[in-house]
Design a protein with these regions (language model features):
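A beta-strand signature from Gram-negative outer-membrane beta-barrel systems
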Residues: 126, 135-179
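Short acidic/polar hinge/loop motifs at secondary-structure boundaries
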Residues: 106, 114-115, 121-148, 495
């Protein structure tokens, strides 16, 4: 069969280019009078800046959007409104969400990879790039900033994009509150909090518990989260915040993936091995940190420091015969992780320069140390329990990154340039020596520069160009297992190389009719040594380097206050992500032009919000996603495209010192059966994870102000 010609660069980006030209024409006829809808952000620039004036793609999701009719459980509730992001809710709290930005992170079998997660400036990702979205607590979020494109490379390794949450400070009169939510599949969530300010000290204490039976069989979960924050001024020239957070999930059931036939027969079903081995995961995550800021005239010193501990025990469905092999690492993963780190940053305005010139110099230090053990997942005839020791090692990842950034606004021009020197060292101290000593280390070094320039054609139309070079080291989890023969011992994959990338972006930012904001961008990313799945069996995944990949795309974001009572939001992404050279994987040749698995070609999110009166809001949400390939050869059944629609409403009342609110939410209004996420490259062909049908949720809350 003759191969289908690959779409040209022009065919991929022509629609985006036409959209950019249309924006330019629309803005050229706008008057000078306008009302800015742009929020202030610090991600990408370190200095608080209007998103409209920054020469790269950055968005902010505000507190009202995070809280309006949402459940406050998962980032998948709010992140789809950002173009370029794909958020897949696995309906599996043992494996967390899958989030990708312009294709970065799509390969992740669990957790977040390829993206930098931050909370109040403190990393929520380990130095090697592994993160968990659940550690970001939506109950306390003031805003979430999302940076995409070349400018994200200033954040170093594994920063294909940056997602940064900022918690709110305790302010105003002290108050206490409680809310409860119930819903489909046995969902219940209870939330308590107190916050306010007294004697110059702001405080916020928050605790919640979520229970669910899960949509699929064997997917029950309980999640407990706590958060505490104190913020105050030690003196007139400084600010200090002390922050503590925790996440606990005990015996969270893991339903694993589904084959296509099993999914079609019963979307709620699980493979027999999930119940036979009682696949599950327990997480205990605790973290404490501080943010200190001191002003020296016009200059600012910022210091962040944190310490944390994370313990995980995970029971896999590794068959008994494999788990008992003395050359293998068993079927139970058990590790205790300590992760300290900190940042020192100096922000210096240069008043002698023409225009507005700001310099930033900083140093980031991060470390994670895993005391990792592996056990058989059986004891005698009893399956799904911890048996004999099969792996014992200490894995350490350490990064030390100095960086420099300059931003210069002069007349109609804004220029920003930065460079970061990233050093990452991974070490393994093998203490299980009966099958050989697998100790070793690997060091990665790379300079990641970025440059952006913006020109203000009019006060309401800004155009920009951005370029950068990045790199993505493998995570310790990706290096944990080398692709080896069946009778060879499990060894660390020190041969895995980092992926390197060159990114380019061009965009327009426009304000139309005084009430509408539009951001549009076209981009291209070329990557070498892309890290891809080599094999995935029974919950154990090994990785390898492929050749080259090519990603070209277009993003469009729109936010409009249509009238006093109506708001609209739109986020559209068109992305072609393909392999740009042949490579060998799993005994097969993956040909140039094959699509990267886990990356939809088209994504669309739309929202219409009606607020007929104070304290009443109603929203309609729609989301479309094109088909998603599940493995590199693109020969297995792709997860089909789908469109789903949701509806929500929220009511608020005030009575003296009391405030009340209620919410009702319906997801998947038309009860569509669809695959919500995929497990890339699963060796058992269990690629698919079903999403729920029609689901309902209802909640109520009360707050008292002293």
């Amino acid at each position: 069969m003759p191969s289908r010609p690959r779409p040209s660069f022009v065919s991929h980006l022509l629609p985006g280019s036409l959209a950019l030209c249309g924006l330019a024409l629309a803005c050229a006829v706008q008057g000078e009078e306008r009302r800015s809808l742009e929020p202030m952000v610090v991600t990408g620039s370190y200095n608080p800046s209007d998103t409209f004036d920054l020469p790269f793609s950055v968005d902010s999701i505000e507190r009202r959007q995070i809280a309006d009719g949402q459940l406050g459980i998962n980032l998948s509730e709010v992140l789809p409104r950002v173009p370029g992001l794909v958020v897949q809710n696995r309906q599996n709290y043992a494996q967390d969400l899958q989030i990708s930005s312009r294709g970065y992170g799509a390969r992740s079998a669990f957790g977040i990879r390829g993206l930098k997660l931050l909370a109040d400036g403190i990393p929520a990702s380990t130095p090697d790039g592994q993160g968990q979205a659940a550690t970001l607590n939506l109950d306390v979020a003031e805003r979430i900033e999302v940076l995409r494109g070349p400018a994200s490379t200033i954040y170093g390794s594994n920063a294909g994009g940056v997602i940064q949450m900022f918690s709110r400070d305790g302010q105003g009169a002290p108050r206490v509150g409680a809310e409860t939510t119930v819903g489909s599949d046995g969902l219940s969530r209870n939330h308590l909090y107190t916050e306010g300010e007294g004697d110059g000290v702001g405080f916020l204490v928050d605790a919640s518990r979520m229970d669910t039976d899960g949509y699929r069989d064997h997917s029950a979960a309980r999640r407990d989260q706590t958060f505490a924050k104190l913020n105050f001024r030690p003196d007139a020239d400084s600010r200090l915040a002390l922050i503590y957070s925790s996440l606990e999930q005990n015996d969270t059931e893991d339903p694993l993936g589904q084959t296509w036939d099993a999914y079609k027969h019963d979307p709620r079903s699980v493979t027999a091995n999930a119940e036979l081995y009682d696949t599950r995961k327990s997480i205990d995550h605790q973290q404490a940190g501080m943010n200190y800021e001191r002003y020296f005239g016009e200059a600012t010193l910022q210091v962040n420091a944190y310490v944390g501990k994370r313990s995980v025990v995970q029971y896999l469905s590794i068959p008994r015969g494999v788990a008992s092999n003395s050359q293998r690492g068993g079927g139970v993963v058990d590790f205790d992780r300590d992760f300290p780190g900190g940042t020192v940053r100096w922000l210096q305005p240069v008043s002698q320069a023409p225009g507005e010139l700001n310099l930033t110099v900083g140093l980031d230090y991060d470390q994670s140390r895993d005391d990792r053990r592996g056990y058989q997942n059986f004891n005698g005839d009893q399956l799904g329990v911890k048996g004999e020791l099969r792996r014992d090692e200490v894995d350490t990842a350490t990064s030390l990154d100095p960086y420099l950034q300059a931003s210069w606004a002069i007349d109609a021009w804004t220029l920003q340039a930065g460079v970061r020197h990233s050093t990452m060292k991974m070490e393994v101290d093998d203490r299980y020596l009966s099958n050989g000593d697998a100790s070793g280390s690997r060091r990665y070094r790379k300079n990641t520069p970025s440059f952006s320039v913006m020109y203000a054609f009019t006060p309401d139309l800004h155009g920009y160009l951005s370029a950068g070079k990045g790199f993505e080291t493998p995570t310790q989890a990706e290096m944990a297992y080398a692709p080896v023969a069946a009778n060879a011992p499990d060894v660390f994959n020190f041969g895995l190389k980092p992926a390197t990338s060159s990114q380019y972006e061009a965009g327009l930012k426009a304000r139309l009719w005084g009430n509408t904001r539009v951001n549009a961008a076209i981009f291209q990313i070329r990557t070498e040594d892309e890290i891809v799945v080599a094999s995935s069996l029974g919950g154990r995944t090994s990785y390898q380097n492929a050749g080259k990949t090519l990603r070209r795309g277009f993003e469009l974001g729109l936010e409009s206050e249509l009238s006093e009572h109506w708001n609209a939001n739109l986020a559209y992404t068109r992305l072609s992500a393909t392999y740009d050279s042949d490579f060998e994987a799993g005994g097969k040749t993956i040909g140039k032009g094959k699509h990267l698995p886990g990356v939809p070609e088209s994504s669309l999110f739309g929202e219409l919000v009606w607020k007929p009166a104070e304290g009443i809001s109603m929203g309609w949400e729609g989301m479309y996603r094109s088909q998603v390939y599940v493995e590199d050869s693109n020969s297995e059944k792709a997860a089909p495209s789908y469109a789903v629609f949701n509806w929500r409403t929220r009511f608020e009342q005030r009575l003296g010192a009391w405030a009340f609110h209620q919410l009702v939410r319906l997801d998947n209004l038309f009860d569509r059966q669809y695959v919500g996420s995929v497990i890339v490259g699963d060796g058992n062909r269990r690629y698919y994870e079903a999403a729920p049908g029609l689901s309902w949720y209802a909640g109520a809350g009360v707050e008292y102000q002293f």
